[in-house]
């Protein structure tokens, strides 16, 4: 819907001077002016895409049905107490302006130039934000994806295809006739090997494809575009998995002839490394019997005692008020720095290994910390699991959303008063 904000003609121009109700929707109504404005927006959007418009009566009914379902979601938002603050709305408007490479003021001017008021645009954005939050509460938060579902997806052909890396390939095909005898096959094999040797000696792959390949993409230098690694047939799937960008395969026999592939680029599927830090800390918090100043003094005292030779772990067990680590001598074990609050992360980043930090403050209280080690770990498998989780959640969300929208529509009282439409009361 937000794309309609930049239509070349004012949507308001379609609004009739005399308004009337075109649908009763539970405790609210849809007005003719709302319908006319949205129909005009849809017409403009379809025209920009070069598509054909359905008959006016059909389009009116389709758009009205969409407005009815939107209205029902807005009523749910109202009953649920969902409110969009001015600050949130301003931030959303600013984000939309930024996506269109505009400042907020340029965005306002562009709307005015296209005949749409800034106030109407803000209201439309507000409605969409309310609907988004309603869907989040009623649909998205109820979706569960089990570990077994993730494992099954990763093991499936579909999962392997969707999560595999993509390869940008070029090919050269030295053909063999369909009923070729052994001599013709050997001749093609020799030519393929000659081409391969020239490529290994530095010949340009694109030029060699134009001159020698029988593939239908020969004139494009053999460019095959991007292909999913999981979709490639043997033996290329195995060979390409270990190749670097720029590498060339040896000629391989296929039903159509001998093929040579060049790996131009690859994306996705790479190993993903994550930095981890082994750290321990002592946390002391202000309380009704110990104010901020006294808490800071205690942290400084603990720092001094550790520097003087007392055992960090024993002091953590006695004084630390972090219930998750105190019993372990303050040890947080290996942890992703991004899981920590910014102040803690910043001190940890600049602390040399084995050296105690000076007391510092976060939202939780006063800390002293010591970095025990740093390492980079391969998080590729965790990243794949997270990708699979996202794919499965999105799939379930799409299904659940459509089911929920049908449900709220079926359960609502709707009386359509649009001329020419089927009169319905539910």
From Swiss-Prot:
Fetch the InterPro entries from UniProt. Answer: OMP_Chaperone_SurA, PPIase_dom_sf, PPIase_PpiC, PPIase_SurA, SurA_N, Trigger_fact/SurA_dom_sf
Tell me which UniProt keywords the record has, alphabetically.
Chaperone, Isomerase, Periplasm, Repeat, Rotamase, Signal
Main EC class the enzyme belongs to = isomerase
Q: What GO molecular function annotations does the UniProt record carry, in alphabetical order?
A: peptide binding; peptidyl-prolyl cis-trans isomerase activity; unfolded protein binding
In terms of one coarse class, where is the protein primarily found?
periplasm
Intracellular or extracellular location(s): Periplasm
- Domain-related comment: The PPIase activity resides only in the second parvulin domain. The N-terminal region and the C-terminal tail are necessary and sufficient for the chaperone activity of SurA. The PPIase activity is dispensable for SurA to function as a chaperone. The N-terminal region and the C-terminal tail are also required for porin recognition.
**Record-listed E.C. numbers:** 5.2.1.8
Signal peptide residue numbers: 1-13
| Pfam families tied to this protein | Rotamase, Rotamase_3, SurA_N
Sorted alphabetically, the Gene Ontology cellular component annotations on this record are: outer membrane-bounded periplasmic space
**What Gene3D superfamilies does the entry give?**
3.10.50.40, Porin chaperone SurA, peptide-binding domain (1.10.4030.10)
Please describe what this protein does: Chaperone involved in the correct folding and assembly of outer membrane proteins. Recognizes specific patterns of aromatic residues and the orientation of their side chains, which are found more frequently in integral outer membrane proteins. May act in both early periplasmic and late outer membrane-associated steps of protein maturation.
Catalyzes what? [protein]-peptidylproline (omega=180) = [protein]-peptidylproline (omega=0)
Q: Which GO terms describe its biological process?
A: Gram-negative-bacterium-type cell outer membrane assembly; protein folding; protein stabilization
Q: What is this protein called?
A: Chaperone SurA
User: Does Transcription show up as a keyword for this record?
Assistant: no
Domain PpiC stretches: 164-265, 274-373
Record carries keyword Nucleotide-binding:
no
């Amino acid at each position: 819907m937000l794309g309609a904000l930049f239509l070349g003609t004012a949507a308001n121009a379609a609004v009739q001077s005399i308004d009337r109700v075109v649908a009763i929707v539970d405790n609210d109504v849809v007005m003719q002016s709302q319908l006319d404005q949205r129909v005009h927006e849809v017409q403009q959007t379809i025209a920009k895409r070069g598509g054909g418009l359905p008959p006016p009566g059909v389009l009116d009914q389709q758009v009205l049905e969409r407005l009815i379902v939107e209205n029902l979601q807005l009523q749910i938002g109202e009953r649920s107490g969902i409110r969009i603050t001015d600050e949130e709305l301003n931030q959303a408007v600013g984000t939309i302006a930024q996506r269109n490479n505009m400042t907020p003021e340029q965005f306002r001017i562009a709307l005015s130039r296209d005949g749409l008021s800034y106030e109407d645009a803000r209201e439309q954005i507000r409605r969409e934000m309310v609907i988004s939050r309603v869907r989040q509460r009623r649909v998205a938060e109820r979706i569960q994806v089990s570990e077994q579902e993730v494992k099954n997806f990763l093991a499936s052909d579909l999962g392997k295809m969707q999560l595999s890396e993509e390869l940008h390939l070029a090919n050269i095909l030295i053909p063999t006739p369909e009923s070729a005898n052994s001599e013709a096959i050997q001749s093609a094999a020799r030519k393929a090997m000659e081409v391969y040797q020239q490529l290994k000696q530095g010949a340009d792959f694109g030029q060699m494809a134009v001159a020698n390949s029988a593939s239908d993409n020969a004139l494009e230098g053999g460019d095959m575009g991007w292909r999913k690694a999981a979709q490639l047939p043997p033996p290329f799937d195995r060979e390409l998995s270990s190749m670097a960008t720029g590498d060339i395969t040896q000629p391989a026999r296929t039903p159509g002839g001998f093929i040579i592939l060049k790996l131009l680029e690859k994306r996705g599927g790479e190993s993903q490394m994550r930095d981890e830090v082994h750290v321990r800390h002592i946390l002391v918090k202000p309380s009704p019997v110990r104010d901020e100043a006294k808490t800071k003094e205690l942290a400084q005292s603990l720092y001094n005692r550790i520097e003087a030779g007392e055992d960090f772990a024993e002091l953590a067990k006695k004084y630390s008020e972090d219930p998750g680590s105190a019993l372990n001598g303050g040890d947080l074990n290996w942890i992703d720095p991004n899981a920590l609050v910014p102040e803690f992360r910043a001190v940890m980043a600049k602390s040399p290994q084995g050296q105690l930090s000076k007391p510092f403050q976060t939202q939780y209280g006063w800390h002293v910390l010591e970095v025990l080690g740093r390492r980079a770990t391969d998080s590729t498998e965790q990243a794949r699991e997270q990708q699979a989780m996202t794919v499965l959640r999105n799939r379930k969300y799409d299904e659940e959303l459509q089911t929920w929208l049908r449900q709220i529509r079926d359960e609502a009282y709707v009386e359509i008063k649009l001329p020419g439409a089927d009169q319905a009361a539910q």
